[in-house]
Amino acid sequence: MSIDRYGAPGCDDLAVCRLTADGMLDCVYELDGHMRVLNHDGCTVSTVQASTVPKPRSWPGGACATADGTLFVSNRGPNTISAWQRSGPTRHFLCEWPTGDWPRALCAVPGTLYLLAACQREGAVHCYYCSPLPRRAPTETASLALPGASCALVLD
């Protein structure tokens, strides 16, 4: 399978999230601020802005998907996290909430409803409880000071 990583002029793929059972691939593009769903041939089948906040401009920093198919995207610029659900080839908006300065990486904690966000310029990793989306906004449950935080991983 070849993927056209230059789906739009001036864009670059930053995060390839998951290949779904139907052969679709979720991609987040940093430079043009969009999310795309690609088919098995690498062709774009849908495109949506990664953040619903119009200004400042969004540069998605990272993304992760949960077992139920929820896609979380960190939006640098507006400093938010957006949550999306896919139905067929398109993504549908669930919610968006503020987070720390310059969210660079996200990690869904397997087997839980927790999400970690590494916020680089703030120098912190934030932990959010994400249930039930979209009826209730996620709540921050912890924050860890970590200068230059740029990655969040769960290690066994």
Regions found by a protein language model. Give the residues of each.
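Beta-propeller fold detector
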Residues: 1-6, 45-50, 92-98, 136-146
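Blade-level signature of beta-propeller repeat domains, shared across WD40, Kelch, NHL, RCC1
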Residues: 120-132, 137-156
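Short loop/turn segments immediately following beta-strands, especially the blade-tip
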Residues: 38-45, 84-90, 128-135
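Structural signal for beta-propeller blades
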Residues: 33-36, 79-81, 123-125
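Conserved beta-strand positions in repeat-built beta-propeller and related beta-rich domains
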Residues: 21-22, 27-31, 71-77, 117-120
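Beta-rich, blade/repeat-based domains predominating
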Residues: 5-25, 52-68, 97-114, 144-156
